[in-house]
């Protein structure tokens, strides 16, 4: 099982690199998405190709389609084939995608700015806040820790940087062939968005999903 998770992770890392190569000013966003999906299929296709005694192969491939979301589009933008939108210098671009091997899923997300210019001000603050919150959550994902306390930590980091956590975005546990499990870590609690506190358990797998904004969230 662990080996299959590692292979899936290697595949999403390769796919992310393929997407990044397409993220240049003037290039079509849809082409970047297509490059990610094609890379996942190509990379996962290198493994577990022998058939079992019943003639079946291990299932593998895209677990979450490549999404490329620009500027105020929060996430999960996967345009149709005919979409003509292109990247522009200075665009803030969020990439997210996922691959699986035998149902064991690995996901990946990256944020970049088109053009490679130095990022400053509020844009730098929000990107650093999301990165730091992710690093802290990884350290806090230990057996016995509370999902509610982890969520509160995310909000605390955002406050320190003067930015907002995007409401409605949650971190889910994952199981085989299940990308959105029942146990969640809320990035931001609200009257409309609540979850009972639960303990992190040994051998659980989580897909961190932390999104922050310079707006109200």
Which residues fall in each region the model found?
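Active-site neighborhoods and metal-handling regions in enzymes and metal-associated proteins
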Residues: 1-217
